[in-house]
Amino acid sequence: MSEKIKKQCIVLLSGGLDSATILNIALENYDVTALIFDYGQRHKFEISAAKKIAEIVDIPIKLITIDLGQFGKSALTDNIEVPKNQDIGKEIPITYVPVRNTIFLSYALAYAEVNNIFDIFIGVNALDYSGYPDCRPEFIEAFEKMANEGTKFAQGNEKINIHTPLINLTKAQIILKGTKLNVDYKLTHSCYDPSIDGLSCGECDACILRKDGFATAGIIDPTNYI
């Protein structure tokens, strides 16, 4: 009996905890191509993390280089200090990169249309998130509608699906799910402001959410902190 041919999909792979988890979720049912973005982020260690994660599961990658630092206004792409030990979720933080997920999904959509791929996975999360408006279900629904209205290849019977399997999960639930899927979280990088040798600061929003997630899940955090 021949093996069932899997559909193709695109996974936006940042190298972080969430994207590593959705990669393993997607691999259960799809042949995956990972899109990795070098967008001028200060935490470039996530790029090498993403490449390593993709290498481990032996999937093709497409590295896309864009310079969001040209626009600034974010602590991740501009000469702005990354906030530490602040209350998360009170307001949209300075680590928000303007229109980042719209840009990333647009690149993914272009790659999808050229390669006739109808499924895109992104690891946005609306519960344990830092107040980013482009991580909300409403944003994803709006983008998916736009994608199906504005592309040639979606005018037939098959439609584009933006998959967000983590959107209603807490960080602890994500970690528990990924652990069951054998995600190696030691390979992932979350920190917004790592040391020169890649150690995580332990105090930025991303580090706090990560540490709290592992603690709540009752799983040892494999991250190397300063």
Model feature map: region roles:
Residues 157, 161, 196, 222-225:
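Residue-level signal for alpha-helical context at structural boundaries
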Residues 199-200, 206-226:
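Iron-sulfur (Fe-S) cluster-binding segments and ferredoxin-like electron-carrier domains
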Residues 65, 122, 185, 192, ...:
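Non-transmembrane, interaction-prone segments in cytosolic or luminal domains
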Residues 181-202:
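Immediate flanking context of iron-sulfur cluster ligation sites
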Residues 1-2, 67, 204, 221:
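Serine/threonine-rich low-complexity intrinsically disordered regions
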Residues 2-181:
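ATP-dependent adenylation/nucleotidyltransferase module used to activate substrates
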